[in-house]
Amino acid sequence: MKITEGRFRLSLLLLLLLISAATLISAADYSPTEKILLNCGGGASNLTDTDNRIWISDVKSKFLSSSSEDSKTSPALTQDPSVPEVPYMTARVFRSPFTYTFPVASGRKFVRLYFYPNSYDGLNATNSLFSVSFGPYTLLKNFSASQTAEALTYAFIIKEFVVNVEGGTLNMTFTPESAPSNAYAFVNGIEVTSMPDMYSSTDGTLTMVGSSGSVTIDNSTALENVYRLNVGGNDISPSADTGLYRSWYDDQPYIFGAGLGIPETADPNMTIKYPTGTPTYVAPVDVYSTARSMGPTAQINLNYNLTWIFSIDSGFTYLVRLHFCEVSSNITKINQRVFTIYLNNQTAEPEADVIAWTSSNGVPFHKDYVVNPPEGNGQQDLWLALHPNPVNKPEYYDSLLNGVEIFKMNTSDGNLAGTNPIPGPQVTADPSKVLRPTTRKSKSNTAIIAGAASGAVVLALIIGFCVFGAYRRRKRGDYQPASDATSGWLPLSLYGNSHSAGSAKTNTTGSYASSLPSNLCRHFSFAEIKAATKNFDESRVLGVGGFGKVYRGEIDGGTTKVAIKRGNPMSEQGVHEFQTEIEMLSKLRHRHLVSLIGYCEENCEMILVYDYMAHGTMREHLYKTQNPSLPWKQRLEICIGAARGLHYLHTGAKHTIIHRDVKTTNILLDEKWVAKVSDFGLSKTGPTLDHTHVSTVVKGSFGYLDPEYFRRQQLTEKSDVYSFGVVLFEALCARPALNPTLAKEQVSLAEWAPYCYKKGMLDQIVDPYLKGKITPECFKKFAETAMKCVLDQGIERPSMGDVLWNLEFALQLQESAEENGKGVCGDMDMDEIKYDDGNCKGKNDKSSDVYEGNVTDSRSSGIDMSIGGRSLASEDSDGLTPSAVFSQIMNPKGR
């Protein structure tokens, strides 16, 4: 084949770029000298996991110090859809103490233990109760993987430790507890990897927050990683880390209150430059190229804190590592962005100025702090808050954070073991122990030896030939579709790969409690669907919608309940809506969005499989139902949950997503009454920064349809706000959005409720069940919020963030009044509620004299305030916990 000179030059250029890229990647990676991946209970052959890492079996392994007769190997009885096969489908089970011995060099090691609580060898998973020790250190004690998974709604658990090995041997002992008598221990996988000594501090510069004394972290200190977050960015999988195989997770699930701040991404022309003395393996480029700030409005920023809340074990000291990198090209000088860092309501850094630390933007920096939480039992909260420092009058009243790592430090007797979390609605999920695949492509973990340029050339040539061959096959039409005859996992690409995905904001808020990996969608065969629904038994019909019927089903041998939506060929909603639903939900994982498990497209069918929502729709509990009436606080919490889901759609994904069909039948309730937004068949990607709207054919549901959208056929996220305002009035009045049996002026709730509001008679159309159960302050705030949502002009409506904030505030007002013994009024005084004629100002409006909903406690607010005579500025406010101040809907059963 003749190649022109131009093509030859282009090929040569591509080759050089590939070699350069390979060299850069290898330079950024740490190369472990030891890497042991032990597949416990596995067969004789080695297996490869989803990150392309090879796991060796422990059967007849040299690492078995104890006799293999003292343990048994067993496969898991069942496999959750979210659980990878390697290393979780086999385990080694111990009924007496059992020791693994790993011959390794002296020095620091990452030790990761992998657990999938299931039935092994016929044993009950709840009877698994054991300790794990290494030398003088107790890593786990009285540990129940089953209880932990249930409490945190995880399918599987990863425990990561940092230990120091001396003497060339790492002995790890698993010991079943003495009680109950049938207790046993198990483990699915063990990872031992060498690491650089990157967390020690022996020079006296590390101090305890709130104290002047220094803290030493040396070889005698063992650590457990409890959180590792990529603030403002995506999840980062182990294969996309810097050779250390750490998992980094999205920070949004941990943000307190509605003050989410805004994600920032390094300017495209900015190169992240690690300073001399800072190894590039400290944190990936993707951590330093994304951040979260408070936003551009100084007035707002000065009235709240950007706050994260973490659940931790009491009785331990914690190492908190914060990662910083100025990502804005506009900030190049000292005193442009200065802020205060608080840890547990104590000042950790009075004047944090990233440029002062680094001398330039685009330069990574990290700083360590040690926190000693108050004494207590069980679990407590660790707070991290940022607030602008106005003392030196910086150019921007703002703050910035790129990454967070939190480690538990061993006690004086070598203990790292905390208590098992208690299942219940108050347990906060911790995704730092769940391995969730991301969209990033795996990169090689084997460092390229310096000087091996020929290896890079060969690699580049191989890649080039593969790409060329793939191109030729595509041209010839040689690609064959995968068979859809059996169930399998089909990757649905989210927003890109590798570093290009760094700015693509995917959230798994709450995603961490999902039953599925965030980037995989299961493909079911039609035979599986028929078996799950008992051949579409009509007695299993849960409901009928525009797309078709929804059936109750069971998959995976009856172990998992699901809802199965079967498309009706005669429905107006067809292939486009089917594809939209898959594309949208496969990209989104959030506590308040219904999870898509998979789909089926065989035999011209269009079938979607979702998580089962035990309590059905919100509407089923408001009117025309035999169900008991919902209490007011529960209605508020459901509205808050739905608002969180919509707020995430509008702001949390890479592009704004407009739902376009918000209504009470599309707000579903799980077994713990956690609200989840559903039905994305009509959803639309919203406008970019360069546009204010999307021109589209009008779609939606009558009674909820934004009149401005209907008139102008221009869709914005404010159309969802309008529809949600109707939902709020439905929750308050317990009547349909449209009721043609009523008088003409009362048919539309979106028109009748505002009319009653303006006339001061809204209390007269409130659900009679709620009379005497809503405090006047709460009623006023809720009514104002709903009213602003349904204003005629979209520009006058609040954002979903504002709506969420005000609903949280309304709930706070209700709870505060109840706790302080204030009475609730059957007849709310509507004369006190002044209609503002639509001239409402959002929290991004600098001219607003009052910041709607800026009420938090002292840990998320820059001001002291009180409600009902109780100060919220005090740490010890008569038991008024953060969960009492703001309903976070942090139910771990939410996914």
From Swiss-Prot:
Pfam families named in the record: Malectin_like, PK_Tyr_Ser-Thr
Comp. bias (Polar residues): 884-895
Post-translational modification: Autophosphorylated. Phosphorylated at Ser-858, Ser-871 and Ser-874 upon activation by RALF1.
Catalytic activity: L-seryl-[protein] + ATP = O-phospho-L-seryl-[protein] + ADP + H(+); L-threonyl-[protein] + ATP = O-phospho-L-threonyl-[protein] + ADP + H(+)
Chain ranges of the Protein kinase domain: 536-810
Membrane topology: Single-pass type I membrane protein
CDD domains with a match to the protein in the record: STKc_IRAK
GO cellular component: filiform apparatus; plasma membrane; plasmodesma
Residues binding ATP: 542-550, 565
InterPro entries: ANXUR1/2-like, Kinase-like_dom_sf, Malectin-like_Carb-bd_dom, Prot_kinase_dom, Protein_kinase_ATP_BS, Ser-Thr/Tyr_kinase_cat_dom, Ser/Thr_kinase_AS
Membrane-spanning ranges: 448-468
Tissue/organ expression: Expressed in leaves, buds, flowers, siliques, young ovules primordia, and young anthers with immature pollen, but not detected in mature pollen. Highest expression in the synergid cells of the female gametophyte.
Residue ranges, annotated region (Disordered): 844-895
Localization in the cell: Cell membrane
Other information: Female paralog of ANXUR, a male factor expressed in pollen tube that controls release of the sperm cell. Named after the Etruscan goddess of fertility Feronia.
Subunit structure: Interacts with ROPGEF1. Interacts with RALF1; triggering phosphorylation status and subsequent activation. Interacts with LRE and LLG1. Interacts, via its extracellular domain, with FERONIA at the synergid cell surface.
Name of protein: Receptor-like protein kinase FERONIA
Biological source species: Arabidopsis thaliana (Mouse-ear cress)
